[in-house]
């Protein structure tokens, strides 16, 4: 409006009808006076629309307004046809028109979006510090409801396996590189300290991309086009450490045990290679089906466990035809193929079920992409939940540092960080269930099962 040199008045009243906007001189190709009405909804409601159209048509009939622009995101061809027949001066601006305005006024649109986001952050900062625990209880109640309905799927990350003593990503790469160095020196006598020093230095130098390191190691540990040597090396590194009992895996297993009314967990998607979940389910004699490639199917009485990055069992031989999403090229392959079976499984699960994410850092760009796609197809309500650890003051205040950091400033920074993290995850259709210590997660899972 400013670019066209035309005045705009918000919250304008005509004959007792309060409208969202008014321009005496019109807008664009629409001759004035022009009035604006905005309806905030993402679903078309015929009853509400008929009432709205009747009200706006009445204002147009009074001839005090030349054109009426209805801004309504839940537009449809049927609705446009209906409005044209009612009154040709009743104009609909739907998603297409709104996006067109945004594209034509990108700087202004970005300014508005940033201003709204800052207002939202400021409002959230006024909450009391301990409100997050109250919010957590409310979220757990929502998860309980979905669990009781049997509409929960579990998404499990490396944190689950690490809770039982298996190596994290960095430790796994260290073990593989040690294997690689030993392979280079072959029969030469090289002491363990030298190998360890070389390994640590290599990982430090190439720390910017762990996927690139994995690709490098795969090339070094494989033979020609055969991945068997590499998968064997991964298996050795994965299961070399002593397993420990895991309260987290026990709590996950308990969630999966059916109740009288039936199974409450519909499926498990794991991004881990190991069989710790299968091993735990076997102990309680729960029927399951491990699925790690397209051809696999499960029976109705089996709990499907999808290993979307591949599967390497501990005590059994691995499938020689199986592939791992471990290195850079494998990740690129999955990322670039929208109809890859693992993408289809994840997307269907995210669209159809309430997902509870455990032990995931949520930094995986492919998972974030799938979450965003699923969120676009859903209503504005978030239907997924993720356990995420809160940052503490100690993580930002370094006692050894020469710079004295004000604790009050750190508290404000952390509070803002946590709010932004929540808003960012909400844009991916996910609500954050905060925890401070990993030992809290099994307790919270047990609370969901009650």
Predicted regions and their residues:
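Nucleic-acid nuclease catalytic cores
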Residues: 60-93
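Glycine-rich phosphate-binding "P-loop"
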Residues: 36-47, 219-248, 321-338
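SIR2/sirtuin-family catalytic core signature
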Residues: 96-154, 160-162, 174-175, 179, ...
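Glycine-rich phosphate- or other oxyanion-binding loops that anchor nucleotides, phosphorylated ligands
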Residues: 305-342, 348
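Acidic-basic catalytic patches of nuclease active cores, encompassing PD-(D/E)XK
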Residues: 1-17
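Structural motif
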Residues: 37-42, 71-75, 309, 360-361, ...
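Short, charged/polar "capping" segments at the starts of alpha-helices
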Residues: 75-81, 276-278, 392-398
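Conserved catalytic cores of phosphodiester-cleaving nucleases, focusing on short active-site segments
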Residues: 19-57
């Amino acid at each position: 409006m400013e670019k066209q040199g035309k005045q705009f008045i918000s919250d304008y009243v005509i004959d007792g009808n309060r409208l969202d906007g008014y321009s005496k001189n019109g807008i664009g190709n629409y001759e004035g006076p022009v009035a604006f009405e905005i309806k905030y909804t993402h679903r078309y409601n015929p009853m509400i629309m008929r009432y709205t159209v009747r009200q706006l048509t009445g204002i147009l009939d009074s001839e005090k307004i030349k054109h009426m622009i209805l801004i309504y995101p839940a537009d449809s061809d049927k609705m446009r046809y209906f409005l044209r027949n009612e009154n040709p001066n009743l104009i609909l601006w739907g998603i297409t028109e709104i996006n067109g305005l945004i594209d034509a006024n990108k700087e202004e649109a970005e300014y508005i979006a940033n201003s709204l986001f800052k207002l939202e952050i400021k409002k959230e900062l006024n909450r009391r510090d301990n409100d997050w625990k109250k919010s957590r209880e409310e979220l757990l109640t929502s998860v309980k409801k979905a669990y009781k309905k049997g509409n929960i799927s579990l998404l499990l990350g490396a944190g689950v396996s690490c809770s039982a003593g298996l190596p994290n990503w960095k430790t796994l790469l260290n073990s593989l590189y040690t294997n690689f160095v030993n392979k280079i020196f072959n029969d030469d006598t090289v002491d363990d300290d030298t190998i360890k020093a070389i390994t640590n230095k290599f990982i430090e130098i190439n720390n910017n991309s762990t996927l690139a390191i994995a690709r490098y190691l795969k090339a070094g540990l494989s033979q020609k086009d055969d991945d068997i040597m590499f998968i064997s090396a991964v298996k050795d590194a994965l299961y070399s450490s002593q397993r420990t009992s895991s309260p987290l895996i026990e709590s996950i297993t308990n969630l999966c045990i059916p109740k009288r009314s039936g199974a409450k967990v519909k499926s498990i998607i794991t991004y881990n290679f190991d069989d710790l979940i299968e091993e735990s389910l076997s102990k309680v004699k729960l029927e399951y089906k491990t699925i790690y490639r397209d051809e696999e199917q499960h029976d109705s009485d089996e709990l499907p466990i999808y290993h979307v990055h591949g599967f390497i069992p501990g005590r059994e031989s691995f499938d020689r035809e199986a592939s791992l999403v471990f290195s850079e090229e494998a990740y690129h392959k999955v990322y670039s193929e929208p109809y890859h079976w693992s993408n289809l499984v994840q997307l269907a699960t995210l669209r159809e079920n309430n997902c509870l994410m455990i032990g995931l850092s949520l930094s995986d760009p492919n998972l974030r992409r799938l979450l965003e796609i699923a969120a676009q197809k859903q209503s504005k309500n978030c239907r997924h939940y993720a356990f995420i650890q809160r940052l503490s003051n100690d993580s930002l205040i370094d006692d050894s540092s020469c710079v004295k950091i004000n604790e009050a400033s750190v508290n404000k920074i952390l509070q803002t960080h946590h709010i932004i993290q929540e808003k960012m995850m909400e844009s991916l259709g996910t609500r954050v269930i905060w925890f401070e210590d990993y030992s809290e997660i099994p307790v919270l899972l047990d609370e969901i099962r009650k």
